[in-house]
Amino acid sequence: MPRSVPSVASRERRKKILKLAKGYFGRRKNVWTVAKNAVERGKVFAYIGRKQKKRHFRGLWIQRINAGTRQHGLSYSQFIGALDKANIKLNRKVLADLAMNDPEAFKAVVEKVKK
């Protein structure tokens, strides 16, 4: 037998959606049917955004690595190919962080790859 609670389930569902719609403009924030559609659409965009975030960050890391390697006379593709041949297992996130925040260490990696 389901648990008995004093509140009505449908009211709780509506309150949950209206709480998620807080901050929306116009009728989207307080009219149930409009808010429901707006929240549903917002959740779709949030899902898509979580996937796109991974792509965008990878692109950003590649740009940073490319900028760092060009200062040392290599292109990004040459650098990544040479990294693979030298059997250095650093991912793009770490390489981008080195290029931005620790140029000396990044230079050491580039020099190791150039040999």
From Swiss-Prot:
Keyword flag Nucleus: no
Domain of life from the UniProt record: Bacteria
Descriptive protein name: Large ribosomal subunit protein bL20
Organism: Cytophaga hutchinsonii (strain ATCC 33406 / DSM 1761 / CIP 103989 / NBRC 15051 / NCIMB 9469 / D465)
Keyword RNA-binding carried by entry: yes
Family of the protein in this entry: Belongs to the bacterial ribosomal protein bL20 family.
NCBIfam families: rplT_bact
Keywords: Ribonucleoprotein, Ribosomal protein, RNA-binding, rRNA-binding
Alphabetized InterPro entries for the sequence: Ribosomal_bL20, RIBOSOMAL_L20_CS, Ribosomal_protein_bL20_C
CC annotations in GO: ribonucleoprotein complex; ribosome
Record's function text: Binds directly to 23S ribosomal RNA and is necessary for the in vitro assembly process of the 50S ribosomal subunit. It is not involved in the protein synthesizing functions of that subunit.
GO biological process: ribosomal large subunit assembly; translation
An MF annotation (GO) of this entry: structural constituent of ribosome
